[in-house]
Amino acid sequence: KMKKQEQQKNGCRERSLASISRRVSSGAMLVALAMIFSYVESLIPINLGVPGIKLGVANLVTVTGLYILTPMEVFVVVILRVLLVGFMFGNGMSILYSLAGGILSFLVMLLLKRIKGFSMIGVSIAGGVSHNIGQIAVAMCVLENTKLVYYLPVLMIAGTITGILIGVVSQKILPAVSQGAGAERKNG
């Protein structure tokens, strides 16, 4: 009987390690994908007269991740993406702005995802808008210029439009990503 219990423990341990390995490799893959998206996006010039407007393609990873990973795993992916992209392609200020936008966006999307009645597109829109709010808040503090708040309406419209696009694409790819990764949808 003791031998059987020991075998069951070892079996659970092996399944647990396999699960951890699968989650770590999935997280690493998502970080790499987000980095690629960020880099490609940096090559696309968007000049609409207001600095800071981007498509936010890397947010595909964050939005989709909220539906297939645990909140902590998504948070780690967001932080790693911001830091790695910032160190490789940006500078200290870009890291600061991206951290503010990324963390606020993550928290808002996580909260809204947990509230019944918000679709993936709605969650994504809120993420796009809150990302811009976070960045403007940091810019106002760093530059000690409250007049930057006047950029906010345009950035909120841009965040809404890009949020819709990212949300629609995320909704379309979620079934394939969930199935391909062998992930179960997390409602956390």
Model-derived regions: residue spans:
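Hydrophobic transmembrane alpha-helices
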Residues: 3-4, 9-64
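Short helix-perturbing small/polar motifs within transmembrane alpha-helices
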Residues: 4, 14, 27-31, 36, ...
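Hydrophobic alpha-helical transmembrane segments
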Residues: 24-29, 60, 64, 71, ...
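Transmembrane alpha-helical segments of multi-pass membrane transport proteins and ion-pumping complexes
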Residues: 31-39, 86, 102, 106-110, ...
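Interfacial aromatic-anchored transmembrane helix boundaries in multi-pass membrane proteins
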Residues: 38-55, 78-110, 120, 142-147, ...
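Membrane-embedded alpha-helical hairpins and interfacial helices in multi-pass inner-membrane proteins
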Residues: 51, 91, 95-96, 114-188
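Generic transmembrane alpha-helix motif of multi-pass integral membrane proteins
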Residues: 57-71, 108-113
